[in-house]
Amino acid sequence: MAIRILIPTPLRAYTEKKESVLLEGNTVGELLRGLTATYAPLKKHLFDDTGSLRNFVNVYVNDEDIRYLQKEQTQVSEKDTVSIVPSIAGGRS
C-alpha cells in the first residue's frame, strides 16, 4: 500500500524538488526510513547520529502529531497522508 508523504519546501532540494512522495510502509518509521533510503542526503536532516528522529522535525499523520500517538511506531494505511514539518525558529532577541 502506497502512502503519500508531503515534503516541506526546505527539504525538497533533497527529494529532486518533489512536493510529495509515495512509499510503501506500515508505520511512520518504515516510511521515513524508506524515504531516506531513496533520498540519502535527506537522512541527516531528519535523523541524528544515533538514528533518532531529530527534535526539531515534526511528523503528522492526517494532522495528528505522532508524538501524541505512537511516535515512529504509529500505524498508517493507504488513506493516510504523512507530513514532515521542520520547526523554524526566529525573531528578535
Predicted regions: what is each one?
Residues 1-93:
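Ubiquitin-like/PB1-type beta-grasp interaction modules and other compact soluble beta-rich domains
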